[in-house]
Amino acid sequence: MALLAEHLLKPLPADKQIETGPFLEAVSHLPPFFDCLGSPVFTPIKADISGNITKIKAVYDTNPAKFRTLQNILEVEKEMYGAEWPKVGATLALMWLKRGLRFIQVFLQSICDGERDENHPNLIRVNATKAYEMALKKYHGWIVQKIFQAALYAAPYKSDFLKALSKGQNVTEEECLEKIRLFLVNYTATIDVIYEMYTQMNAELNYKV
């Protein structure tokens, strides 16, 4: 669980403004999460998350004061790009990033909630399938969907996944799940606010890749 516990997201302030710098720092440690899933087929999601973090950081670094919050990024780029927005810049990168982050959130929440295949309780296929269908499937074309369906069948045992997530530390399953629940508190709240922001600003795009 060390992978998640070491980099908790900050609690949201009352105005729900998400500071760009601390957000990027926290999520930059998440791509190795996909290594814990064992299958190289998850590598594209890992690469997508890393690439989009890099794109957002490049914009942020040009003017940290101007882009202090994620909300600032969308507002400034909407003014800057006009009719091209939201298909450009950090706005587009954050749109895809939030989907990868949602995959992680739904997957971990499903495991914490005890959702499983009763015939194969130590498999995490049910959890990974739910996460993919809720976070990413609708944005993928038929070929990409088939690739990921194959990957889901190659997902590791839950015990092996939790051990990888704990970086080999000798902790019980319940201790690991408790730390995941702690991680999810601020993480889920943050992802929800980003989704709300895209809805409110009409910045969500539904094209497939």
Curated annotation (Swiss-Prot):
Record InterPro entries: GLTP_sf (IPR036497), Glycolipid_transfer_prot_dom (IPR014830)
Residue stretches of each Sequence repeat: 45-55, 56-66
Job of this protein: Accelerates the intermembrane transfer of various glycolipids. Catalyzes the transfer of various glycosphingolipids between membranes but does not catalyze the transfer of phospholipids. May be involved in the intracellular translocation of glucosylceramides.
Keywords, ordered alphabetically: Acetylation, Cytoplasm, Lipid transport, Repeat, Transport
UniProt KW Acetylation keyword: yes
Family label: Belongs to the GLTP family.
Name assigned to this protein: Glycolipid transfer protein
Binding site for beta-D-galactosyl-(1->4)-beta-D-glucosyl-(1<->1)-N-[(9Z)-octadecenoyl]-sphing-4-enine: 48-55, 140, 207
Effect after changing residue 96 to A: Almost complete inactivation; 1-3% residual activity. No effect on autophagy
Annotated effect of mutating residue 55 to I: No loss of activity; 90-97% residual activity
Entry-annotated residues carrying N-acetylalanine: 2
Localization annotation: Cytoplasm
Primary localisation category: cytoplasm
Subunit structure: Monomer.
GO MF, one example: ceramide 1-phosphate transfer activity
UniProt note on tissues of expression: Detected in fibroblasts (at protein level). Detected in fibroblasts and in various cancer cell lines.
GO terms, biological process: ceramide transport; intermembrane lipid transfer; response to immobilization stress
Gene Ontology CC annotations of this record: cytosol
Ranges for region 2 X 12 AA approximate tandem repeats: 45-66
Listed result of changing residue 103 to S: About 25% decrease in activity
Recorded consequence of changing residue 48 to V: Significant inactivation; 15% residual activity
Mutagenesis or variant effect for residue 96 to F: Partial inactivation; 63% residual activity
Protein species of origin: Homo sapiens (Human)
One Pfam assignment: GLTP
